[in-house]
């Protein structure tokens, strides 16, 4: 059995919307919308990983309390083996964070970012684990 790759991601919730970023066409998950985040380094704590990844991707330092709200499992194409596990954190804020993709270290991983409410989440698969988790969080209020 292969080692499962670990990731961290953050749902940035502002009012009744969440921040999502669209992946570029050449990286992993090309053209898909997702939460900011990425791969953890060896022995890196998930909280440290999301703080690092968020800064690298958005040029913004997370300064609010983060809360672990769930996990998203990723499987190989036939669904027989888990290949990745994402620790998903939630950060609630009253002020929109506007990612600075142009000046971010890894800003080229995304082509755009935006805020979406529960009715307009840009996921092709509404049954995707991440989409369901975001929907549950947005409908809590």
Q: Where are each of the predicted segments found?
A:
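Charged phosphate-binding loop/patch that engages nucleotide di/tri-phosphates or the phosphate backbone
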Residues: 126-141
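Conserved hydrophobic "DFG−1" position in protein kinase catalytic cores
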Residues: 12-13, 20, 91, 115
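Unchanged
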Residues: 40-64, 73-129
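Conserved N-terminal beta-strand and adjoining loop/helix that marks the start
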Residues: 1-19, 36-39, 85
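A generic fold-level signal
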Residues: 3-5, 13, 27-28, 81-84, ...
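Short, flexible active-site-adjacent loop segments at beta-strand->alpha-helix junctions, enriched
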Residues: 16, 24-25, 72, 95
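Conserved Nudix-box catalytic region and its N-terminal flanking loop in Nudix hydrolases
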Residues: 17-56
């Amino acid at each position: 059995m292969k080692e499962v790759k670990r990731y961290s991601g953050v749902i940035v919730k502002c009012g009744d919307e969440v921040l999502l970023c669209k992946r570029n066409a050449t990286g992993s998950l090309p053209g898909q919308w997702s939460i900011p985040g990425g791969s953890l380094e060896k022995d890196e704590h998930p909280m440290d990983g999301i703080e690092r990844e968020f800064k690298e991707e958005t040029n913004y330092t997370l300064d609010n309390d983060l809360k672990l709200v769930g996990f998203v499992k990723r499987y190989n194409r036939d669904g027989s083996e888990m290949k990745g596990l994402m620790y998903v954190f939630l950060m609630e804020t009253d002020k929109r964070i506007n990612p600075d993709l142009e000046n971010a270290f890894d800003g080229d991983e995304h082509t755009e970012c935006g805020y979406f409410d529960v009715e307009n989440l840009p996921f092709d698969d509404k049954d995707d684990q991440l989409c369901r988790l975001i929907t549950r969080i947005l409908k809590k209020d």
